Amino acid sequence: MSLTRLLIRDFRNIETADLALSPGFNFLVGANGSGKTSVLEAIYTLGHGRAFRSLQIGRVIRHEQEAFVLHGRLQGEERETAIGLTKDKQGDSKVRIDGTDGHKVAELAHLMPMQLITPEGFTLLNGGPKYRRAFLDWACFHNEPGFFTAWSNLKRLLKQRNAALRQVTRYEQLRPWDKELIPLVEQISTWRAEYSAGIAADMADTCKQFLPEFSLTFSFQRGWEKETEYAEVLERNFERDRQLTYTAHGPHKADLRIRADGAPVEDTLSRGQLKLLMCALRLAQGEFLTRESGRRCLYLIDDFASELDDERRGLLASRLKATQSQVFVSAISAEHVIDMSDENSKMFTVEKGKITD
């Protein structure tokens, strides 16, 4: 699936834009603040319902406007799909697919699997466990049809259980929540564990190509003690949870631990090496999805040249081309991306929110 056309209205500093896109590489070139990252963010928002630079909707809607509007056309092997997203200052969204309203953002996300690589993306490696849980859950969402419903129910039940912990005095009073919670926890943890095991070799192989000087290992931690049933953990930790007023163990505490030569990567790798590792993980995840489902990701890469020397940029470019996926790349100068260009690529110039090709 590739995005063949993108219409943007009142998004960030872009008043209006109508872009015909390449199914291969699309380059967005312009000075800092020109709006090139806003194009990437518009694509991301169309597939996620939210921007990646700010959660405050007022900062995403163009100044003095009431809403942004995004439309796109997706070309699959057999059919074309029209999609749209409108969001106003109150945060209310309207999702349209093939001319009909009433759809959910999750449907857009399923239609447009994306991998995002930005200068802020180091949080996958040096941020908290929630970023690595999101990495795992992205894959579970795209590979397991029941994941989104299970994950939504898990969040709801954990919120209810945590509220109940402020009121109950005996564990028996929590059993109604735990009876529903336990099978969801076991299913989600199983999906995460199976995915982690399945992609481990792919991640190791890709990382070896990008960072041959390190031995990288990946280990999934499910969020509670190994070999212990979750039901037992909940009951045994009731008093502690009640004092904390939240559930201290479970899949909401899971992590994917990444080590280089036995030490945490954030303590071992330079910024340039961390970016290479981030790129390797995103590529491995996208390639794994293609192999397992036949679906290809869209790759969004902001500030392509930052932190990478010529050799590493060339390696990343060759790996991206090998995916045969649609790729969007922003850069300050065309010189940074000219070697990646071919007869099927499109080069866009961005200046003060105006986009030309």
Curated annotation (Swiss-Prot):
Annotated localization: Cytoplasm
Gene Ontology cellular component list: cytoplasm
Key words of the record: ATP-binding, Cytoplasm, DNA damage, DNA repair, DNA replication, DNA-binding, Nucleotide-binding, SOS response
Sites where the protein binds ATP: 30-37
Keyword Secreted: no
Keyword Repressor: no
Function: The RecF protein is involved in DNA metabolism; it is required for DNA replication and normal SOS inducibility. RecF binds preferentially to single-stranded, linear DNA. It also seems to bind ATP.
Record-given protein name: DNA replication and repair protein RecF
Organism: Shigella boydii serotype 4 (strain Sb227)
Gene: recF
